[in-house]
């Protein structure tokens, strides 16, 4: 695939933005919330390798008439028209899957639709976690237990045993792809080989569970009504979620991003193992399977970034 085929020309977006502003100006809820649509600016974020990938979305904060930030807008690009709609539909499916006590961390848009075939959505405003390293130490100390418990409960609510007939595609194939990756260390490949042996012998009976698949610090937010030091949180960006995903990938991404202390991390891993009915060594098999699935479905994710992530998460798993 050439850069032209996998990139998006930002010059194609201004007509979409103008059409979007016109469409929103006629919506009653926009007026009820006093949102200054005419002033909103949408940004695709930084370029990646000097181009915008075709899965880029435009984002912006919408202020009210008093210039107070009041809402968040997400809009697809003309080459990936359904990106935002797909994100919303996946979040709806996830919210419907979880118990009401656990699905409140998922915010759905209060408005969404299409303009010129390009999907968009507007959400109540949430706030990112702090970038101040001193504040972050206290913030994460409050959040690690509640996010960790939420993760454990989600696995408990959505756990399903994978039928034997599904093992070749669901487990063996991803693990074999790990073994075929030349840039992975021998120890990592050996881990995948051992996982396949445990599966073949029946010592490991794998399960699926809901997987967000990108559960890092940037996708955990604070609701606008919460204070900076809070145990309330929201999880955003469900586009890559899988209702029947591979356990442990979310957990290790979370442990990495939040630099969770070893003792607490070991407890969280054991909680997952207890729910899934597996041994602690099988956590590595789950992680490598999830990494294999990711490697088979990179889409716009650069291969070098995948290799780096996989090595880091595998190395992290050995420390627990």
Model-derived regions: residue spans:
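A conserved alpha-helical element in kinase catalytic cores
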Residues: 74-116, 135-154, 249
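Conserved short submotifs of the Hanks-type protein kinase catalytic core
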Residues: 117-129
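Active-site Asp-x-Gly
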Residues: 226-275
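An alpha-helical support segment within catalytic cores of ATP-dependent transferases
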Residues: 23-43, 161-212, 223-230
């Amino acid at each position: 695939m050439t850069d032209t085929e996998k990139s998006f020309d930002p010059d194609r977006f201004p007509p979409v933005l103008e059409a979007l502003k016109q469409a929103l100006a006629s919506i009653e809820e926009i007026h009820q919330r006093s949102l200054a649509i005419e002033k909103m600016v949408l940004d695709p974020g930084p370029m990646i390798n000097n181009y915008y990938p075709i899965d880029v979305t435009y984002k912006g904060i919408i202020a009210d008439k008093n210039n107070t930030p009041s809402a968040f807008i997400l809009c697809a690009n003309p080459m990936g028209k359904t990106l935002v709609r797909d994100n919303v539909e996946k979040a709806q499916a996830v919210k419907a899957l979880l118990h009401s006590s656990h699905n409140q961390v998922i915010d759905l848009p209060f408005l969404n639709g299409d303009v010129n075939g390009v999907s968009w959505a507007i959400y109540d405003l949430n706030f990112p976690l702090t970038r101040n390293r001193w504040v972050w130490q206290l913030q994460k100390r409050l959040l690690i237990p509640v996010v960790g418990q939420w993760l454990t409960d989600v696995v408990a609510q959505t756990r399903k045993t994978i039928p034997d007939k599904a093992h070749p595609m669901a487990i063996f194939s991803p693990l074999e792809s790990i073994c075929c990756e030349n840039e992975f260390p021998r120890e990592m490949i050996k881990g995948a080989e051992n996982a396949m042996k445990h599966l073949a012998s029946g010592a490991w009976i794998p399960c699926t569970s809901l997987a967000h698949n990108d559960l890092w610090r940037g996708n955990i937010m604070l609701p606008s009504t919460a204070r900076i030091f809070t145990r309330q949180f929201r999880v955003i960006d469900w586009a890559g979620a899988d209702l029947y995903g591979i356990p442990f990938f979310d957990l290790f991404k979370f442990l990495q991003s939040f630099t969770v202390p070893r003792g607490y991390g070991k407890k969280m891993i054991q909680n997952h193992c207890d729910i899934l009915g597996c041994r602690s060594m099988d956590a590595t098999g789950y992680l490598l399977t999830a990494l294999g699935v990711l490697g088979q479905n990179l889409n716009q994710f650069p291969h070098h970034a995948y290799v780096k992530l996989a090595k880091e998460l595998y190395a992290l798993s050995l420390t627990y």
